[in-house]
Amino acid sequence: WMMIVEQKCRVIVMLAKCFEAGKKKCQKYWPDSEETKTFGRVKVFNAEEVKYCGFLRRRFHIESFDEMMSVEVFQYQYINWPDHSVPNTTSNLVRMHKYVIQCLEEIGGDAPMVV
């Protein structure tokens, strides 16, 4: 979360699930919906979690104690990518991409994005 704050990132794109076929693929680095978690000097509140066909969108409120700032960050997580394979169709991934582009335009097209 420090990198998100330092780079003033407003959008995170994630293409993996935390677990696939019973194996851990990614560390869950965010709090559950409607919960707050502190990571070092950064407080993260998961304000909203919306499920779409093939992906999730989360809206976080981030507070940095060092930077004395508060910002809204969006995370898009594609959940239909099978382990060691490719999706059967790209329609959900293309749809998520459109949402990401729209989000970037709404918050300012020059905002950094982490993929």
UniProtKB/Swiss-Prot annotation:
Amino acids binding substrate: 83
Domain Tyrosine-protein phosphatase: 1-115
Disulfide bonds: none
Full protein name: Tyrosine-protein phosphatase 23
Pfam families with a match to the protein in the record: Y_phosphatase
Alphabetized PANTHER family for the sequence: PROTEIN-TYROSINE-PHOSPHATASE, RECEPTOR-TYPE TYROSINE-PROTEIN PHOSPHATASE
Key words, A-Z: Hydrolase, Protein phosphatase
One term of GO molecular function: protein tyrosine phosphatase activity
InterPro entries listed in its UniProt record: Prot-tyrosine_phosphatase-like, Protein-Tyr_Phosphatase, PTP_cat
Highest taxon of the lineage: Eukaryota
Family membership noted in the UniProt record: Belongs to the protein-tyrosine phosphatase family.
The enzyme's E.C. designation: 3.1.3.48
PROSITE patterns tied to this protein: TYR_PHOSPHATASE_PTP
